Amino acid sequence: DEGLKKLSSIGDGYNGFHGIGMMASMGKKANISTFYSLQNEKNNSWNHVVGVNVTSKWKKIKVGVTAIENISKPTQAHVENDTKNEPQSEKRGTNTQALIGANARYNYGKIDLWGEVAVSQGTKWGIAGITGMRYTPVSDVYLLAIYRYYSPYYSNPYANALCSWSRMRDEHGGYIGLEYNKLKNWQLSTYADVWKNGYEVMAQGDWLPKQNYHMHMRFRVKEKDEACTYSLRWNM
């Protein structure tokens, strides 16, 4: 939602952007950016991507809209690897995909609200949405709450949002986190993430008595698809 950046990284080597882009300001409150990417791979595969982003700021509100058109001819090996967890109707892959998203952020004192909704058009339309709130009651104390929903047919190779899987697909859940940094030389954090097929709970403490000394301890419990794992890590 920020338009073009000097340095960025997206996905793997296949999903990276290689091309040109430009950004223009529309007064002091808005800017528009656009880009075009062309990538040729071995085995006669190629990928064309064109996109546009418009972002506007007004007092404490920021809104943005992004549209991307992706036309590609992936290799058969990439299709099989990229779609092995997708619904059967999508395993053939698509040569053309449209992505449209809108986002908004609002700050009210100690509360920061944000959200984003997007749709993807491939063999079927899919929708995804994520919204969250960050509350800072006092300095160095942060509370975070997030809710997400990704439909089974949503597909976006460029997205990198909160998800229990590597791909944003067929999931809905809630996340609550706390960070507490008011103790001298200590950084404490914890979170709980619950989705339809599992959950994850984590507690972490970092002790930094000196600039070149760091002690780190983390405890995590995770259940995913009826498989439960426990982990305890201690680093010095």
Predicted regions and their residues:
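Signature for the C-terminal beta-barrel architecture of outer-membrane proteins
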Residues: 3-236
